Amino acid sequence: MDVRRAQEIASSPVMANVTYNGQRIYIEHVDQQKGVATIHPLDNPNQKQSVPVASLEEHS
């Protein structure tokens, strides 16, 4: 995924189907300069982590 699309998803009120390492996640914040996103698994909001945006996959 590119940084621009990750930012669009993070800003959208519509929930997108995005995964990180096969697990569905929620994008909390995108740092466009560093190319990283703060995410958490849908089933565990307390498990926040920063990951490269390129490692996120959007599914339709």
Curated annotation (Swiss-Prot):
Gene Ontology biological process terms in this record: asexual sporulation; sporulation resulting in formation of a cellular spore
Region Disordered, annotated ranges: 39-60
Name of the protein described by the UniProt record: Small, acid-soluble spore protein H 1
Gene that specifies this protein: sspH1
Expression induction or repression: Expressed only in the forespore compartment of sporulating cells.
Cellular component GO terms held in the UniProt record: endospore-forming forespore
UniProt similarity note: Belongs to the SspH family.
UniProtKB keywords: Sporulation
Chief subcellular location: other
Localisation: Spore core
Matches recorded under InterPro entries: SASP_SspH
One Pfam family this sequence matches: SspH
